[in-house]
């Protein structure tokens, strides 16, 4: 029996809401049809490049499942809430947001890490000129030059928000007093804000901030993907989480998703030209080709070798939590991390 599928991904990009899908009338289900599972995520960016590649290449179907990826906004909290409420089986979320939810009692498990650091900071052209610091100056000079500026990033408390705070502290700035940080829950507001001169700089996942470059509003100031900040290149900024009971009751589906993500990760690493072209066409077509290629090429080392959420990355994030590592004294890395996703 032939099954026609309906898969709809709602995407909120920097230019508005776009619905992408393959639609058709559904036939009655049969036992050989792939199981449809929902994954919630923030708006498409290279933070979720591996899940996007899984959808683009349909590696999920190769492992007996069909993933309905619903992606919008900038807050991982919404995705976590959907997982906890049973509205989604999987959440593709920011690492710190996931860990904070677990610390607060959310019965979640980390089954995969899908990206390292893809945060980019773009500074307004006129601000860069006024500072008198070159965008190729030593990173310490570029970070310290942010003193007194207004910088917008992801929602307050989000992974992007905390990455930025850690950069500032690393180079001697107080993120609460030396820089005016603004958390934004709507990704398109980052680009429009820098265009309208409300922000001096914006920091978020590539390639969303590159829209500001494409529109002539700014230039790259700090690049996580190219390793500008020492020690931040392997910190696992994006995770896949599930409820603990999902592992107990649906381990086969968890394993199927991990296998599909592994295939997608291999494509990201070894088939970069073809994968980049496909992602550009499906999710980032409104980004001019040259700008997209620059953003994609910069992520060569931004994706991990495997899906492990390392103990090293865990230690990094709990140390950079605003409440400190001590607030995780009742959290056990080995318990919250799926056994096959653990590594030093």
Region locations from a protein language model:
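Short, glycine-/small- and polar/acidic-enriched structural segments
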Residues: 30-174, 182, 200, 204-206, ...
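Pocket-lining segment of extracytoplasmic ligand-binding domains
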Residues: 189-280
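C-terminal motif of bacterial Sec signal peptides marking the signal peptidase cleavage site
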Residues: 19-22
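Conserved C-terminal helix/tail region of periplasmic/extracytoplasmic solute-binding proteins
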Residues: 318-344
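Bacterial signal peptide processing site
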Residues: 24-26
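Short, solvent-exposed loop/beta-turn-alpha elements that line the ligand-binding surface or hinge
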Residues: 62, 129-136, 143, 226-233, ...
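Bacterial N-terminal signal peptides that target proteins for export
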Residues: 1-11
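Secondary-structure end/capping motifs
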Residues: 247-324
């Amino acid at each position: 029996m032939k099954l026609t599928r309906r898969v709809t991904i709602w995407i909120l990009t920097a230019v508005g809401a776009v619905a992408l899908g393959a639609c058709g009338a559904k036939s009655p289900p049969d036992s050989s049809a792939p199981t449809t599972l929902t994954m919630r995520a923030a708006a498409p960016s290279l933070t979720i490049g591996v899940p996007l590649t899984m959808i683009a290449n349909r590696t999920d179907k190769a492992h007996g499942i069909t993933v309905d990826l619903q992606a919008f906004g900038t807050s991982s909290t919404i995705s976590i809430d959907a997982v906890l409420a049973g509205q989604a089986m999987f959440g593709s979320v920011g690492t710190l947001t996931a860990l904070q939810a677990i610390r607060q009692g959310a019965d979640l498990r980390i089954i995969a890490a899908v990206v390292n650091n893809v945060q980019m900071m773009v500074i307004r052209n006129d601000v860069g000129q006024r500072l008198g610091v070159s965008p190729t100056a030593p990173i310490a000079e570029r970070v310290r030059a942010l003193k007194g500026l207004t910088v917008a990033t992801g929602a307050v408390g989000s992974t992007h928000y905390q990455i930025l705070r850690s950069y500032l502290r690393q180079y001697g700035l107080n993120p609460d007093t030396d820089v005016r940080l603004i958390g934004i829950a709507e990704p398109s507001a980052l680009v429009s804000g820098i265009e309208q001169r409300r922000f001096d700089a914006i920091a978020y996942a590539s390639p969303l901030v590159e829209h500001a470059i494409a529109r002539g509003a700014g230039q790259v100031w700090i690049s996580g993907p190219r390793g500008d900040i020492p020690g931040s290149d392997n910190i696992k900024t994006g995770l896949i989480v599930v409820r603990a009971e999902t592992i107990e009751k649906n381990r086969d589906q968890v394993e199927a998703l991990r296998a599909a993500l592994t295939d997608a990760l291999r494509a990201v690493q070894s088939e970069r030209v073809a994968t980049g072209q496909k992602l550009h066409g499906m999710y980032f077509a409104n980004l001019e080709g040259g700008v997209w290629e620059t953003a994609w090429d910069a992520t060569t080392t931004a994706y991990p070798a495997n899906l492990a959420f390392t103990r090293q990355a865990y230690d990094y994030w709990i140390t950079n939590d605003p409440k400190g590592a001590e607030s995780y004294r009742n959290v056990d890395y080995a318990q919250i991390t799926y056994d096959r996703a653990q590594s030093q």
